[in-house]
Amino acid sequence: MNLKGKNILITGGSLGIGKETAKFLVDKGANVLITGRSEERLLAVKDYTGAKHIVFDIADIDNISSKTKDCLNLLDNKIDVLINNAGTGCRRDVEQLNIDDFLHVYNTNVFGLSILTKEIIPNMKKQNKGTIINIGSTASLKGYKGGSIYASSKFAVRALTQCWQAELRPYNIRVCQVNPSEVPTAFANKERIERENIENKLTTKEIAHAITSAIEMDDRGFINELNVWATNPFN
Protein backbone atom coordinates (compact mmCIF):
# COMPACT_ATOMS: atom_id res chain seq x y z
CA MET A 1 0.00 0.00 0.00
CA ASN A 2 1.27 3.43 -0.92
CA LEU A 3 0.64 5.48 2.23
CA LYS A 4 0.47 8.88 0.56
CA GLY A 5 -3.03 10.28 1.04
CA LYS A 6 -4.32 7.22 2.92
CA ASN A 7 -6.64 7.77 5.90
CA ILE A 8 -5.41 6.02 9.05
CA LEU A 9 -7.02 5.79 12.49
CA ILE A 10 -4.76 4.97 15.46
CA THR A 11 -6.25 4.29 18.88
CA GLY A 12 -4.13 5.10 21.91
CA GLY A 13 -2.14 7.65 19.93
CA SER A 14 -1.23 10.06 22.71
CA LEU A 15 1.78 8.13 24.03
CA GLY A 16 4.36 5.49 23.23
CA ILE A 17 3.91 3.22 20.24
CA GLY A 18 0.81 5.01 18.97
CA LYS A 19 2.51 8.40 19.08
CA GLU A 20 5.63 7.21 17.26
CA THR A 21 3.60 5.28 14.67
CA ALA A 22 1.59 8.41 13.93
CA LYS A 23 4.86 10.26 13.29
CA PHE A 24 6.13 7.55 10.92
CA LEU A 25 2.88 7.49 8.95
CA VAL A 26 2.43 11.26 8.68
CA ASP A 27 6.01 11.49 7.42
CA LYS A 28 5.00 9.01 4.69
CA GLY A 29 2.20 11.33 3.58
CA ALA A 30 -0.76 9.64 5.30
CA ASN A 31 -3.70 11.47 6.85
CA VAL A 32 -3.60 10.25 10.45
CA LEU A 33 -6.22 10.59 13.18
CA ILE A 34 -5.19 9.60 16.71
CA THR A 35 -7.43 8.89 19.68
CA GLY A 36 -6.76 9.18 23.39
CA ARG A 37 -8.31 10.22 26.67
CA SER A 38 -6.26 13.37 27.35
CA GLU A 39 -6.80 16.46 25.21
CA GLU A 40 -3.53 17.91 26.53
CA ARG A 41 -1.47 14.90 25.47
CA LEU A 42 -3.24 14.67 22.11
CA LEU A 43 -2.44 18.31 21.37
CA ALA A 44 1.22 17.66 22.21
CA VAL A 45 1.27 14.72 19.79
CA LYS A 46 -0.44 16.84 17.15
CA ASP A 47 2.45 19.32 17.44
CA TYR A 48 5.00 16.47 17.26
CA THR A 49 3.43 14.52 14.39
CA GLY A 50 0.99 16.71 12.49
CA ALA A 51 -1.79 14.17 13.05
CA LYS A 52 -5.41 15.08 13.68
CA HIS A 53 -6.84 14.08 17.05
CA ILE A 54 -10.07 13.24 18.85
CA VAL A 55 -10.75 12.59 22.53
CA PHE A 56 -12.06 9.02 22.54
CA ASP A 57 -11.85 6.49 25.36
CA ILE A 58 -11.99 3.06 23.73
CA ALA A 59 -13.02 1.51 27.06
CA ASP A 60 -16.26 3.54 27.02
CA ILE A 61 -18.11 0.85 25.09
CA ASP A 62 -21.48 2.62 24.97
CA ASN A 63 -20.02 5.61 23.10
CA ILE A 64 -17.96 3.74 20.51
CA SER A 65 -20.62 3.88 17.80
CA SER A 66 -21.08 7.66 18.02
CA LYS A 67 -17.34 8.28 18.35
CA THR A 68 -16.71 6.13 15.27
CA LYS A 69 -19.03 8.40 13.30
CA ASP A 70 -17.03 11.39 14.54
CA CYS A 71 -13.81 9.71 13.39
CA LEU A 72 -15.26 9.00 9.96
CA ASN A 73 -16.37 12.63 9.63
CA LEU A 74 -12.82 13.77 10.39
CA LEU A 75 -11.47 11.38 7.73
CA ASP A 76 -13.91 12.24 4.91
CA ASN A 77 -15.95 9.07 5.60
CA LYS A 78 -13.14 6.76 4.52
CA ILE A 79 -10.75 4.71 6.64
CA ASP A 80 -8.03 2.82 4.79
CA VAL A 81 -6.16 1.56 7.85
CA LEU A 82 -7.24 0.92 11.44
CA ILE A 83 -4.48 0.45 14.02
CA ASN A 84 -5.91 -0.98 17.24
CA ASN A 85 -3.13 0.18 19.55
CA ALA A 86 -4.93 1.32 22.72
CA GLY A 87 -4.17 -1.02 25.58
CA THR A 88 -3.70 -1.32 29.30
CA GLY A 89 -2.19 -3.85 31.66
CA CYS A 90 -2.48 -5.34 35.11
CA ARG A 91 -0.19 -7.78 36.92
CA ARG A 92 -1.89 -10.14 39.38
CA ASP A 93 -1.03 -13.57 40.74
CA VAL A 94 -3.85 -16.10 40.62
CA GLU A 95 -4.91 -15.62 44.25
CA GLN A 96 -5.23 -11.87 43.70
CA LEU A 97 -7.57 -12.10 40.71
CA ASN A 98 -10.82 -10.13 40.78
CA ILE A 99 -13.48 -9.23 38.25
CA ASP A 100 -12.85 -5.46 38.41
CA ASP A 101 -9.26 -5.87 37.21
CA PHE A 102 -10.36 -8.23 34.45
CA LEU A 103 -13.00 -5.76 33.24
CA HIS A 104 -10.60 -2.82 33.42
CA VAL A 105 -8.18 -4.57 31.07
CA TYR A 106 -10.66 -6.39 28.85
CA ASN A 107 -12.83 -3.30 28.25
CA THR A 108 -9.88 -1.69 26.47
CA ASN A 109 -7.81 -4.59 25.15
CA VAL A 110 -10.62 -6.85 23.93
CA PHE A 111 -14.15 -5.43 24.07
CA GLY A 112 -13.39 -1.88 22.93
CA LEU A 113 -11.03 -3.12 20.22
CA SER A 114 -13.66 -5.55 18.93
CA ILE A 115 -16.59 -3.12 18.89
CA LEU A 116 -14.59 -0.35 17.21
CA THR A 117 -13.45 -2.79 14.52
CA LYS A 118 -17.03 -3.96 14.04
CA GLU A 119 -18.11 -0.34 13.47
CA ILE A 120 -15.38 0.31 10.87
CA ILE A 121 -15.64 -2.92 8.87
CA PRO A 122 -18.68 -1.77 6.80
CA ASN A 123 -16.65 1.23 5.60
CA MET A 124 -13.82 -1.04 4.47
CA LYS A 125 -16.19 -3.52 2.84
CA LYS A 126 -17.73 -0.65 0.88
CA GLN A 127 -14.25 0.14 -0.49
CA ASN A 128 -13.57 -3.59 -1.04
CA LYS A 129 -10.21 -3.18 0.70
CA GLY A 130 -8.58 -2.14 3.94
CA THR A 131 -5.93 -2.99 6.51
CA ILE A 132 -6.35 -3.67 10.22
CA ILE A 133 -3.34 -3.83 12.52
CA ASN A 134 -3.96 -5.25 15.99
CA ILE A 135 -1.21 -4.48 18.47
CA GLY A 136 -0.78 -7.58 20.56
CA SER A 137 2.22 -8.57 22.63
CA THR A 138 4.65 -11.42 22.91
CA ALA A 139 2.50 -12.15 25.99
CA SER A 140 -0.05 -13.45 23.47
CA LEU A 141 2.39 -16.26 22.63
CA LYS A 142 3.24 -17.54 26.10
CA GLY A 143 1.88 -16.89 29.58
CA TYR A 144 4.04 -15.73 32.47
CA LYS A 145 3.87 -15.35 36.25
CA GLY A 146 1.36 -12.66 37.16
CA GLY A 147 0.04 -12.48 33.60
CA SER A 148 -3.40 -14.06 34.05
CA ILE A 149 -5.26 -10.87 33.15
CA TYR A 150 -3.00 -9.13 30.65
CA ALA A 151 -1.69 -12.20 28.83
CA SER A 152 -5.16 -13.72 28.53
CA SER A 153 -6.43 -10.44 27.04
CA LYS A 154 -3.70 -10.57 24.40
CA PHE A 155 -4.37 -14.26 23.73
CA ALA A 156 -7.95 -13.11 23.05
CA VAL A 157 -6.73 -10.45 20.62
CA ARG A 158 -4.70 -13.10 18.81
CA ALA A 159 -7.81 -15.27 18.44
CA LEU A 160 -9.83 -12.30 17.19
CA THR A 161 -7.11 -11.52 14.66
CA GLN A 162 -7.18 -15.05 13.28
CA CYS A 163 -10.99 -15.09 13.10
CA TRP A 164 -11.07 -11.78 11.27
CA GLN A 165 -8.43 -12.94 8.82
CA ALA A 166 -10.68 -15.86 7.89
CA GLU A 167 -13.76 -13.65 7.60
CA LEU A 168 -12.35 -10.59 5.84
CA ARG A 169 -9.85 -11.79 3.26
CA PRO A 170 -12.66 -12.31 0.69
CA TYR A 171 -13.26 -8.54 0.95
CA ASN A 172 -9.57 -7.72 0.37
CA ILE A 173 -9.23 -6.63 4.00
CA ARG A 174 -5.88 -7.55 5.52
CA VAL A 175 -5.64 -8.23 9.26
CA CYS A 176 -2.22 -8.37 10.91
CA GLN A 177 -1.15 -8.68 14.53
CA VAL A 178 2.09 -7.04 15.64
CA ASN A 179 3.52 -8.45 18.87
CA PRO A 180 6.13 -6.25 20.56
CA SER A 181 8.28 -7.65 23.32
CA GLU A 182 9.19 -5.27 26.15
CA VAL A 183 9.23 -1.61 25.13
CA PRO A 184 9.85 1.03 27.85
CA THR A 185 6.81 3.34 27.57
CA ALA A 186 4.14 4.82 29.85
CA PHE A 187 2.21 1.56 29.50
CA ALA A 188 0.79 0.31 32.84
CA ASN A 189 2.14 3.47 34.48
CA LYS A 190 -0.65 5.11 36.51
CA GLU A 191 0.91 8.56 36.07
CA ARG A 192 1.15 7.94 32.30
CA ILE A 193 4.71 9.25 32.25
CA GLU A 194 6.92 8.03 29.42
CA ARG A 195 9.86 5.90 30.56
CA GLU A 196 13.41 6.50 29.39
CA ASN A 197 14.83 4.20 26.72
CA ILE A 198 16.91 1.33 28.09
CA GLU A 199 20.09 0.28 26.31
CA ASN A 200 19.55 -2.88 24.21
CA LYS A 201 15.77 -2.82 24.79
CA LEU A 202 13.36 -2.07 21.96
CA THR A 203 12.13 1.50 21.51
CA THR A 204 8.86 2.74 20.08
CA LYS A 205 10.67 3.47 16.81
CA GLU A 206 11.31 -0.23 16.11
CA ILE A 207 7.64 -1.05 16.63
CA ALA A 208 6.49 1.90 14.52
CA HIS A 209 8.85 0.71 11.78
CA ALA A 210 7.40 -2.82 11.94
CA ILE A 211 3.82 -1.52 11.77
CA THR A 212 4.60 0.79 8.86
CA SER A 213 6.38 -1.97 6.96
CA ALA A 214 3.43 -4.34 7.37
CA ILE A 215 1.04 -1.72 6.01
CA GLU A 216 3.30 -0.79 3.09
CA MET A 217 3.42 -4.32 1.68
CA ASP A 218 1.63 -4.47 -1.67
CA ASP A 219 -2.09 -5.12 -1.15
CA ARG A 220 -1.88 -8.50 -2.89
CA GLY A 221 -0.15 -9.87 0.22
CA PHE A 222 -0.19 -9.44 3.98
CA ILE A 223 1.74 -10.45 7.09
CA ASN A 224 -0.58 -12.40 9.35
CA GLU A 225 1.54 -11.98 12.50
CA LEU A 226 4.77 -10.17 13.27
CA ASN A 227 6.78 -10.75 16.45
CA VAL A 228 9.32 -8.05 17.31
CA TRP A 229 12.12 -8.93 19.73
CA ALA A 230 15.14 -7.03 20.99
CA THR A 231 18.27 -8.62 19.56
CA ASN A 232 20.22 -8.83 22.82
CA PRO A 233 18.34 -7.33 25.80
CA PHE A 234 20.33 -9.32 28.36
CA ASN A 235 23.36 -7.06 28.81
Short names for language-model regions:
Residues D93-V94, D101-L103:
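Substrate-binding pocket helix/loop in short-chain dehydrogenase/reductase
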Residues K142, C163-I173:
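Active-site-adjacent segment of SDR/Rossmann-fold oxidoreductases
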Residues T117, S153:
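Active-site helix of classical SDR
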Residues S14-L15:
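Conserved glycine-rich cofactor-binding loop
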Residues P170-I173, Q177-V178, R195-N235:
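C-terminal helical subdomain
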Residues V55-K67, I99:
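The beta1-alpha1 cofactor-binding region of Rossmann-like NAD(H)/NADP(H)-dependent oxidoreductases
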Residues S137:
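Residue(s) in the substrate-gating loop at a strand-loop-helix junction
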